[in-house]
Amino acid sequence: DDVESRGLGDVYKRQDHIGAEVITTFDLRMTSPNEEPVMNTAEVHTIEHLGATFLRNHPEYKDKTVYFGPMGCRTGFYLLLAGDLSSKDIVPLMVEMFEFIRDYKGEVPGASPKDCGNYLDMNLGMANYLAKRYLDNVLYNIDDSRLVYPE
């Protein structure tokens, strides 16, 4: 079942400058907007926790990660990184992150009343499934047509 997702979109939807630093916003579209069902909040929330944990601990990107979180429409995620980066620059990072999410077992990091305002809204099984789907249908065979944001 092929996904008409835009993949990584135009990896930088935009770039913003904060002082001398460039912040690049990446559009990680996991479902095809207005064509297929959106992701449920529980799996989106789980992917957010796992993705943020992965990025905060990544040897190369932990100091470049500004934000990772869901789109309000629940079709994907935004990743904000410090630096003038292209979509091709982050494909290996996205593969690594979504493999981490696909393979993750155990307690979801930060899923406790002390750390999260909605810690019961988690679905690890669906997060694993959606990460695998994104890897198989988008990231593993990504080409230039999925790395440029459609006009």
Annotated model-derived regions:
Residues 68-140:
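Active-site-adjacent, His/Asp/Glu-enriched structural segments that form or flank metal-binding
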Residues 12-22, 70-73:
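Short, ordered beta-strand-loop transition motifs
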Residues 42, 50-66, 74-88:
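Glycine-rich, N-terminal phosphate-binding loop and its surrounding beta-alpha-beta segment
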Residues 2-12:
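Short, small-residue-biased leader/transition segments that mark boundaries at the very start
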Residues 23-57, 67-68:
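Active/ligand-binding-proximal structured segments within catalytic/core domains
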Residues 17-30, 77-79:
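Generic recognition of long tandem-repeat/solenoid scaffolds
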Residues 136-151:
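Histidine-acidic residue clusters that define the catalytic metal-binding segment
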Residues 44-48, 62, 95-99:
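Generic alpha-helical propensity signal that fires on short helical segments
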